[in-house]
């Protein structure tokens, strides 16, 4: 529960104030692109096609009966920019090299949940399933 | 293990023999104490005096004495033969017999290689004397016996003759026994010699391994990360041992708290302490994973049976919940649903991580095999190096997988703690601990099983 509110809070913080102040770091079109991509489906995963943890999280959702929309950033034209922006959103200021766990990043109902450990933690503490139901990704 | 099983039953036998020896002669009781092991001479020297002083009546008594003495010798032989199969055993056995160390003997001799070997060396002396005395005793006994016979029935020639024949027969038997005994002694000495050589070999191997170890350490001393990895693994094992001891202590407290119907508030303190102590092992494992992910993945710090159930460097959360089963009932419907959901979600998370690991192996395999192999493998060094770098990058993901698996375990324990009441959580921790203790006991039993 605490994870969910925390991430939502940090995301809105990033969207509203920080982004406005750092236009050069966060080009608004990249953020807008992420937002529109995240809204495409109840569950959206930003992934890298060769990443094994991304593979694991896709299997996790499919195992739960959810079919997420997957954006493979290494296969997209603006993938690198999106990746960088996602890392900023997650709060990984040091970049991808020192935190290999940054991707995959999961959005549910257009809102960012976080990377693998956030998703798994909310699944174990029972908050993921209600979230998926609210977003219309799960019916039962 | 084996030697202690073997030696224990012999001791009473040995005692019964010596008590037989002095049966019916209360005046000799005082000699019972100083007579040690198989040093029969003293007893034998005394016996004729006693017999001569007494009447014929003692003749029969002495016959029994002799037979028993012979039987005892036989017993010794059996023991020696039994012992010769394993010379470590013999060492301990003879040590016990020679000096009558009954209880502590095995443990002391077992304490280290060097000890047992020195004990063996000492005891070879013991064996020598005891077997020799054994045969000498018989002769002396015969002599005494014969003299006694003459004293009682000196007028009867035929009796003397038959006694002569008996004596001759017994002397022949003695010679035969002595010959066998010498052969056994030879075999035993040979066995000792073999073990001495084996020990020397082992010592040599150990020395070489030590040298190699120090060479490796010196070789990589420039490479600090390697050295740190070695130290890190070592310090993790140390920390883990310390953690295990602390955990045991906490579990003991918890157990006595549950048994003594401690109040909920006091019990909560104990349960929370165990819970945060679990957090500590996950923190330690996190450090260990950073230092040497393969070591953590191998589970070499756990017992074999624990390793058998290991999944990504630890227990499977879903399995833990299965173990709890009906040990924490009665559960409310809500709790039951919570546990079921937890079991399902931990299972799903485990499956996902397992599939991720499979993907990792698969892609590593593809990366390594895609670089040109075979006859012209040396053709493109750059290609080779590129693929190796890629493979290294993939291996780096391993650390992440291990971290996720530990997070899953930690989260499961925390959620379990949230679902259960304090008393139920206390019982759950005890059940988990008992289960792991059984796994460890099983490992010990398995490792100590007799192997032929």
From Swiss-Prot, chain A:
Q: Where is the Glutaredoxin domain?
A: 31-139
Q: Which InterPro entries match?
A: GlrX-like_pln_2, Glutaredoxin, Thioredoxin-like_sf
Query: Responsive for interaction with TGA factors: where is this motif?
Result: 137-140
Keywords attached to this Swiss-Prot or TrEMBL record, sorted alphabetically, are: Cytoplasm, Disulfide bond, Electron transport, Nucleus, Redox-active center, Transport
Keyword Electron transport in annotation: yes
Phenotype reported upon loss of the gene: No visible phenotype. Defection in sporogenous cell formation in adaxial anther lobes when associated with the disruption of GRXC7/ROXY1 leading to fertility defects.
Q: Which domain of life is it from?
A: Eukaryota
Per the UniProt entry, the disulfide pairs are 51-54
Q: Which GO terms describe its cellular component?
A: cytoplasm; nucleus
**What is its biological role?**
Has a glutathione-disulfide oxidoreductase activity in the presence of NADPH and glutathione reductase. Reduces low molecular weight disulfides and proteins. Involved in flower development.
Q: Which family does it belong to?
A: Belongs to the glutaredoxin family. CC-type subfamily.
Give the multimer and partner information.
Interacts with TGA9 and TGA10 in the nucleus.
What name is this protein filed under?
A: Glutaredoxin-C8
Q: Which species is this UniProt entry from?
A: Arabidopsis thaliana (Mouse-ear cress)
Curated annotation (Swiss-Prot), chain B:
**Where does the DOG1 domain start and stop, copy by copy?**
233-449
**The UniProt record lists the keyword Transmembrane helix:** no
Known CDD domains for this protein?
bZIP_HBP1b-like
| UniProt keyword Iron-sulfur, yes or no | no
Q: Name one GO biological process term.
A: regulation of flower development
Traits of the deletion mutant? Mutant plants have extra floral organs. The modal numbers of organs in mutant flowers are 5 sepals, 5 petals, 5 stamens, and 2 carpels in contrast with the tetramerous pattern of the wild type.
Q: Which family does it belong to?
A: Belongs to the bZIP family.
Please report the name of this protein according to its UniProt entry: Transcription factor PERIANTHIA
List the source organism.
Answer: Arabidopsis thaliana (Mouse-ear cress)
Give me the gene this protein comes from. Answer: PAN
């Amino acid at each position: 529960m605490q994870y969910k509110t925390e991430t939502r809070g940090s995301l809105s913080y990033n969207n509203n104030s920080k982004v406005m102040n750092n236009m050069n770091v966060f080009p608004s079109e990249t953020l807008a692109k992420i937002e529109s991509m995240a809204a495409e489906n109840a569950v959206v995963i930003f992934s890298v096609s060769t990443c094994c943890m991304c593979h694991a999280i896709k299997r996790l959702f499919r195992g739960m009966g959810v079919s997420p929309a997957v954006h493979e950033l290494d296969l997209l034209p603006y993938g690198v920019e999106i990746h960088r922006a996602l890392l900023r959103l997650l709060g990984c200021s040091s970049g991808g090299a020192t935190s290999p766990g940054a991707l995959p990043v999961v959005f549910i109902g257009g809102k960012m949940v976080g990377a693998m450990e956030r998703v798994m933690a909310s699944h174990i503490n029972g908050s993921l399933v209600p979230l998926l139901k609210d977003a219309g990704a799960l019916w039962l | 293990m084996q030697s202690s099983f073997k030696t224990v039953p012999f001791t009473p036998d040995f005692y019964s023999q010596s008590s037989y020896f002095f049966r019916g002669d209360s005046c000799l009781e005082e000699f019972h104490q100083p007579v040690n092991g198989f040093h029969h001479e003293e007893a034998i020297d005394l016996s004729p005096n006693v017999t001569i002083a007494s009447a014929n009546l003692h003749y029969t008594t002495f016959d029994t004495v002799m037979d028993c003495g012979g039987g005892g010798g036989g017993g010794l032989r059996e023991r020696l033969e039994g012992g010769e199969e394993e010379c470590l055993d013999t060492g301990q056995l003879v040590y016990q017999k020679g000096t009558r160390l009954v209880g502590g003997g095995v443990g002391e001799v077992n304490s280290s290689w060097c000890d047992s070997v020195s004990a063996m060396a000492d005891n070879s002396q013991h064996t020598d004397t005891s077997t020799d005395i054994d045969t000498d005793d018989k002769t002396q006994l015969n002599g005494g016996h014969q003299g006694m016979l003459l004293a009682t029935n000196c007028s009867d020639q035929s009796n003397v003759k038959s006694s002569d024949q008996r004596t001759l027969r017994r002397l022949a038997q003695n010679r035969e026994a002595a010959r066998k005994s010498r052969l056994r002694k030879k075999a035993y000495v040979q066995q000792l010699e073999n073990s001495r050589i084996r020990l020397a070999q082992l010592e040599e191997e150990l020395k070489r391994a030590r040298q190699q170890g120090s060479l490796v350490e010196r070789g990589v001393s420039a490479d600090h990360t390697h050295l740190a990895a070695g130290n890190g693994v070592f310090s993790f094992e140390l920390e883990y041992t310390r953690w295990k001891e602390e955990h045991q202590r906490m579990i003991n407290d918890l157990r006595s708290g549950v048994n003594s119907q401690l109040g909920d508030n006091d019990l909560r303190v104990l349960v929370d302490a165990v819970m945060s102590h679990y957090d500590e092992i996950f923190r330690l494992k996190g450090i260990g994973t950073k230092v040497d992910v393969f070591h953590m993945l191998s589970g070499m710090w756990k017992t074999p049976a624990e390793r058998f159930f290991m999944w990504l460097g630890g227990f499977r959360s879903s399995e833990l919940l299965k173990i709890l089963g009906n040990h924490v009932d009665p559960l409310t419907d809500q709790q039951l649903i919570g546990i079921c959901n937890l079991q399902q979600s931990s299972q799903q998370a485990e499956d996902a991580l397992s599939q991720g690991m499979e993907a990792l192996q698969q892609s590593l395999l593809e990366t390594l095999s895609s670089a040109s192999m075979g006859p012209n493998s040396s053709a493109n060094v750059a290609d080779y190096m590129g693929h190796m770098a890629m493979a290294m990058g993939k291996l780096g993901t391993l650390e992440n997988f291990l971290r996720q698996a530990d997070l899953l375990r930690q989260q499961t324990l925390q959620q379990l703690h949230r679902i259960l009441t304090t008393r139920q959580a206390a019982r759950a921790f005890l059940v988990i601990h008992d289960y792991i203790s059984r796994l460890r006991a099983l490992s010990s039993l398995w490792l100590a099983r007799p192997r032929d």
